[in-house]
């Protein structure tokens, strides 16, 4: 489900049910609220819930991010995200497993259909309640191939 509350405010809800032979059945719910600030900038609130046969109760994550799209001197597009978030579970203990703050940098690479991303973040994790949180750096590298493109979409929609 998707709706525009206003010209610059968009809401999306996605519900998915899946059955995997190894993992069993599970469902996920996603809520996304985007507020456009300018043509190439937005603030996003994102929440996801996951419940399944092999999850620890309801597993959840939530984040607030600022995204800005840009175009380099070479004509290649990119985007930068700054975010903070948390994730946790409801069973066997109701706890926040991780707090995080990070950035994600995305850039069009060698071809128009090839993108790379680098995402450094700092995380404060705990595995069991009442233990001390441990801080840890995390760096994710991604390479993405864009198979289908809608040239009519704005850059704002493409950075989502």
What spans do the regions from the language model cover?
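C-terminal structured domain segments
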Residues: 99-128
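Residues that define the transmembrane beta-barrel architecture of outer-membrane proteins
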Residues: 23-29, 56-62, 95-101, 133-139
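Glycine/small-residue-rich hydrophobic helix-like segments
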Residues: 75-109
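Outer-envelope beta-barrel architecture signal
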Residues: 3-13, 27, 39-47, 58-60, ...
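Composition- and surface-driven signal marking solvent-exposed, interaction-prone regions
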Residues: 98, 117-119, 132-136, 157-158
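Outer-membrane beta-barrel architecture
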Residues: 1, 30-34, 63-69, 100-106, ...
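Outer-membrane beta-barrel "beta-signal"
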Residues: 134-160
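Transmembrane beta-strands of outer-membrane beta-barrel pores
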Residues: 3, 15-23, 35, 47-53, ...
